[in-house]
């Protein structure tokens, strides 16, 4: 069982890494929805700075992507829930359609609402292999 303790240092490091625009590109719900429907390949990270597993996963993800000179779209789930949009029920229905119930999640989509998902992460090797495999497609 991973250590689920979270502290200010972990949160700050998470935010510093996800603010690295060479690696992470933060997207809105509308951007995320469009990427799932635009017919183009996209790699998307779903996480949030208040998730204990996310704050421990992001440094590993950052290192892998930096070594491969890749970038990733980042959907901050906390930002989504802070949004007071009148469309929130549509947003929630969209996420239920995707059946994403765990964070962090890595999603690779061809932009046709179909996707591959790598859910919970603890070991660097499988993550690295998965990212390499989708990058080679």
From Swiss-Prot:
Q: Which SUPFAM superfamilies match?
A: Thioredoxin-like (SSF52833)
The entry's keywords: Plasmid
* Gene3D superfamilies xrefs: Glutaredoxin
Q: What name appears for this protein in its UniProt entry?
A: Protein MesC
Q: What organism is this sequence from?
A: Leuconostoc mesenteroides
